[in-house]
Amino acid sequence: MNKKFIFILLIVFICFLNISQSIRINNNKNNNINNNYNNNNNNNIQTKEKRERNLIKFKEIEKIRKFLGNVESLTTIPLVSNEKIILEKLYSDWNGKDWDDNTNWLNGDPCMNQWYGIECNSFDGGITNNVISIKMSLNNIVGEMSTEIKNLVHLQTLDISNNGFYGEIPIGIFQQMNNLSYISLNENEFQGDLEWASYLPDSIVTLWIAMNQFQGTIPTFFSKYPILDLLFLEENLLIGTIPPEVGDLKKIKLLDFGLNTITGTLPSSIGNLSYLEQFWLYDNQLEGSIPLTMGNLQNLKLFEVTRNQLGGDLSGVFLNNPNLKSLRFSGNSFYGDLDWICQLDGLRDVHFDINRFESLPNCLGKAPLQMNELLLADNLISGTIPSSIGNMIGIEYINLARNNLTGTIPSSFNNFSNLNRIDISSNKFNCSLSEILDPIKHQTHLTIISAQYNEIHGEFFENMVWDGVQQIELLTKIFIINLSHNKLSGPIPEYLSWMPNLNDLDLSYNNLSGTVPNQLSFLSTMYLENNPFLGSSDGSLPLFMEPSVIFIHKDTESYACPSIIGKGFDIRISLDSTYYNNSFCLCDYNYRGVNGSCKICPQDSYCPGGGNDILIPSGYYPMPSNENPEYLLKCIISNFGYTSCNPDSSYNYTCQDGYQGRLCSKCVDGYFHKGTECSVCPTGPQSIVIFIVVVVVFIALFLFFVMTDPKRSLPSSTRKTVMYYYQVFNLLLSKLSPWPSFFSIFYSGSSWLNFSFGFLCINNLSRWPNLFIVMICLPFAFLVISIVFIASMQLFHYVKSSLNGVDYIFNKKLIYSGVRVNLLALNFLYLPLCIYIFQNYPCTKDQVTGESFMSFFPWQECGDNSTHNRIMRLTIAFTIIYVIGIPLLFAILLFYNRKRLDNPMILTMIGSIYIDYRKSVYWYELVALGRRFFMAVSLALIDPKSSFSIFVVLLVIGSSIISQIIFKPYVYRISNYSETIGNSVLLFSYVCILILSSLATTKLYDSQGIEIILSVVVVVYTVLLLLLFLFSLKYFLPKKWQTVIDYHIIKFITWVRITSNNLISDIKDINSIDGDDSFETTKEPIFERTVSNNLNVLGSFELKRRNSQINSNCNNNNNNNNNNNNNNNNNNNNNNNNINNNIISAKQLDCNNNNNNYNGEKITPGDGQDCLISLSIDNSGTNFNHNNDNNNNDDNNDNNINNNEEFNKNN
């Protein structure tokens, strides 16, 4: 029963191996179709070789097992009791409950109840049995070799292979088993050396200990076992050389040392193994050549030394081995002639691939007719295939791949009766396809043709698959055809479908054309890529194909295409995307396009891939067009951080409403430029009203400055401070960003000070270059208007005098006033003129196209452009006329008239240039023009965001503050203070904008705090300027009103001073310290009180008022003086009546009193006087003094602590 059961298991196992082998061969065939000979293929080949070896070895082992199984097992006789105990102990030690099969174990008697894997027999005919066999291979046994097993002394067979045993095998454990002939420990994890094997009984026949972790060298003691015929040591960790004592294994039939690390050479003593049939030495590190004594092995059938380092010429080595069937020398360095194999009649397998052979065997006479496999791939074979190869009629598989063969396949290949597979890939066959297929097309068993990587050319013909003479189909068993990487041309014919068993077709990397026929839908694998002329004109796929959802990306492409699969069929298809015009392909991320035409997304843009979509981020402009952008240009950021370029960051790129042109920088119709922004033009009645208001304001200002005397005008110093501050502040607002949105109010309100009249939207006058032309014409317009007005006024007076009969007197004052007005206009226009002129110079070069465009008008091209050239000629001309001419004109006027500045005529004409400054710095207006010039250079001629521009701006504003502190140029103290504070505010604002710009770029910190501080500082200074402006308006009022205003101002200031003094006194008392503990301190001048030389009072202050008439004479007439004295007395009486809270109010005093503490010197007309009212405040009395400062010496005025300069002299 057990014998039959074991026999059936063996038959099933052999069938399983054969089936697995067949499947593996097919798999290897499929895998090798599209791959070069590489490491992966080597692994597959090694796996295949291993299975083949195991099958061969298993056949030899079966002979032993059948011999050992001839003894009948007496199941009716119980087992000796002590052996049952041993088996139970083994069950416990080896954790029997976890075995895959523990049938009947521990139930009754092992022999009678047939415990799984146990065989029994009686040797003495007694009433008890003994255990003679343990066969528990593949039973999931885990543990060490138990020493209990040594007591089973009657054991003949021990097979515990393919389990989980580990550890070392105890020495002597098998020594007492005198009948032990078969040991199989393979495929476990046993360790240690092989010393235990020296204590085996002499009865040992088979020792299979392969695929463990045994270490050390090959022992020499195996020769002491007289009947050992099978020795398996493969796949361990053995090292060293093959000892010569191996030659003493007289009965050995199979010797397997494969897959170790054995070195050295093959000992010649191997020739003594007369019974040796199989010798396995694969995958070691053996060197040298094959010893000639191998010819002594008359019974040798198989010899394998695959993948070693052996070499040499094999001629004459195996001529005396008549039974030799298989020679496996792959992966070595053998060379020489191969004709000697023709003498080996029984040779079936020749595996000589990966060596250094240079020619094929030429068996002209005798040939091995039983040859099945001839493998000579990866050698150095050249020339043509000899026709004598066809004499080996039994060949089933011929592999000549990866050599240097040329020519064609000889017609003698038709002699092969069982040809199954042919591989001539990676050679240099340069024949037609017909010359390759015709010699083999009648092979009825042929399944695989591999001819890739050659130079085969030509087309497919019908006679390749159809025999018209015999009217039969050819190549009906063909399963795989690989003709890739050749030069095939023409269409793929539909008659390839006449090969019914064709499964895999590889025609890739050829020059095929046309379309794929729908008749090939039955294939399982189809490789057709890299056929440049293969494709459909309409971009469609064959009916049996469709794109899958899996996209494949090539390293050299910027798009991914779907893999093509069978429509309703399981077909693996490799087809170029050009076949369907890339219509199913999608661009990669960061690329855009359709149908495989994908361009890289321009820098700073975003392309999601999969189509032509591109997202141009806000603030960038696509070039050369929105539809096909190749690169992006950074757009101008508006003054308040906005951008006109794609503000919504949408895929549909648009400029913001009101913008157009390059960089979205040009205003469309109905919009005007306000800095870098385009604002909507006022329309309807609103535009008319704005225009009328502007015209009326400018006419009123013109008439005011022409008709009024300079002493009656708004104090010039205040006007200049306001104009300079707001002109520069507006320039910063227009050229820098990002300003807080709050400042848009300041920008709109101050634009007109820089003559930005674009908001008028009069036709195209608000656009460049028209606005530039209007600007440079303004000074001439003022001149023409002045001339026309003065001429009209002179004509009016002439006609009036004529009608009244009075002689006409030419009024020179009007001409003087006209000159003064035009100089005033040039002064105020200088900064705007510089800005408009300098903006035309800078051009920015496009780094991609090389074209240049104006930096401040990016839509206008520089260079070869008629408009730009005309404007540049005007710009250069007016740079000389205005930018250089105005300061030069002012300098000439000042230095030419420097000794006549007190002259009434000079004062009337050019007084606006110097009247506001102290006499010692009468030239300071040139400094003011210089700082305007450099501000315009730094923000209009140079890129406002460049480091050089930053340096110039900081230098200009900083030097302005320093010069203001040093020179104190203005006559009025408050003007000096306001000018210094204004420059400080400009400096602070500029620094804040630099910080805000940096924060906007890095986005590391919040900018809200800086925005709030900046807004507060600018608003506070604006309020201060407004108060100063309102204060200066009192000079347009009657003198009585001015006196009342002065009184209230004096009263308020006095209250503030008294309050502050009391507070300071209290603080000093609180903060007083003991003198012994204090350090000596130095009183800082900045906190010292300024006291008038003429006053010795508790507190004092000064109030200057300019005389009302510039041409009035100070009368020396005593009567007039007396009258004036009387007036003064009356005024004093009135003052006494108005004294309140010990505060004395200054009433109107006539500065012409020569008898009232005056020196009585005659004052010539035009000597303008300032009446200095020095008020002494005493809480205990009502005393006061009136002192008139008539000193004309400017240096004395500078030394006066009250700084009562002769401001009137400049008037």
Curated annotation (Swiss-Prot):
Native species: Dictyostelium discoideum
First and last residues of every LRR repeat: 154-176, 179-201, 203-225, 227-249, 251-273, 275-297, 299-321, 323-345, 346-367, 370-392, 394-415, 418-440, 445-465, 477-499, 501-524
GO MF: protein kinase activity
Pfam family, one: LRR_1
Identification of the protein by name: Putative leucine-rich repeat-containing protein DDB_G0281931
Bias (Low complexity): 1110-1141, 1183-1205
SMART domains with a match to the protein in the record: LRR_TYP (SM00369)
Cellular compartments per GO CC: membrane
Subcellular location(s) per record: Membrane
Domain of life: Eukaryota
Membrane topology: Multi-pass membrane protein
Residue ranges, annotated region (Disordered): 1109-1141, 1183-1211
Transmembrane segments: 2-22, 688-708, 728-750, 771-791, 818-838, 876-896, 920-942, 947-967, 980-1000, 1012-1032
Single biological process term from Gene Ontology: regulation of innate immune response
Keywords linked to the UniProt accession: Leucine-rich repeat, Membrane, Repeat, Transmembrane, Transmembrane helix
